[in-house]
């Protein structure tokens, strides 16, 4: 596992602490009222590993339930908008835009979500939720053909804006 793929931080630096845990160890929603409203973006990606027959169907006649990629795209967009309903301490944000790209590779459906906002906190969770919900939808759409589809590699690829600045996975 590379440094970019695992959690980091020693816990000694105040920047290394878990912001959603208070001094007593209780969960809390971070107060972002003092932060500046800035333009922010986040891009996340993930894959759904599928059987060769699923790849063949997605590239051709489609799967029995219908247009899997279009359905997953809409589901991912809806997921991004519903993130604070799914993740308890996530702030409701004014999501400005969600772009979801799905492509069929030789062994997988590859998913990338880019989410934009102008707000006080970032949209990494919205991008991750978009990818996750799209991936779950792909699994649902192909399960009649491939009960062994696997969701994998869901992760933030990039974030821009905010106090902590820009970050890109290397």
From Swiss-Prot:
Protein EC? 4.6.1.17
Write out the catalytic residues in the record: 140
Biological process terms from the Gene Ontology for this record are: Mo-molybdopterin cofactor biosynthetic process
Tell me the Gene3D superfamilies matching this sequence: Molybdopterin cofactor biosynthesis C (MoaC) domain
| Catalysed reactions listed for this entry | (8S)-3',8-cyclo-7,8-dihydroguanosine 5'-triphosphate = cyclic pyranopterin phosphate + diphosphate
- What are the GO MF terms of this UniProt record? cyclic pyranopterin monophosphate synthase activity
Which InterPro entries does this chain map to? MoaC, MoaC_bact/euk, MoaC_sf, MoCo_biosynth_MoaA/MoaC, Mopterin_CF_biosynth-C_dom
Subunit structure of this entry? Homohexamer; trimer of dimers.
- Purpose of the protein: Catalyzes the conversion of (8S)-3',8-cyclo-7,8-dihydroguanosine 5'-triphosphate to cyclic pyranopterin monophosphate (cPMP).
State the name under which the record lists this protein: Cyclic pyranopterin monophosphate synthase
């Amino acid at each position: 596992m590379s440094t970019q793929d695992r959690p980091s931080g020693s816990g000694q630096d105040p920047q290394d602490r878990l912001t959603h845990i208070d001094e007593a160890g209780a969960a809390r929603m971070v107060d972002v009222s003092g932060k500046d409203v800035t333009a922010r973006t986040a891009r996340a990606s993930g894959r759904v590993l599928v059987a060769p027959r699923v790849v063949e169907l997605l590239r051709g006649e489609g799967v029995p339930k219908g247009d899997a990629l279009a359905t997953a795209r809409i589901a991912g967009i809806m997921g991004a908008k519903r993130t604070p309903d799914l993740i308890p301490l996530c702030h409701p944000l004014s999501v400005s835009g969600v772009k979801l790209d799905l492509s069929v590779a030789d062994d997988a459906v590859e998913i990338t979500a880019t989410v934009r906002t102008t707000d006080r906190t970032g949209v990494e969770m919205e991008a991750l939720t978009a990818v996750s919900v799209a991936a779950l939808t792909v699994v649902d759409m192909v399960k009649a053909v491939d009960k062994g589809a696997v969701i994998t590699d869901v992760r933030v690829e990039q974030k821009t804006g905010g106090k902590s600045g820009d970050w890109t996975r290397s």
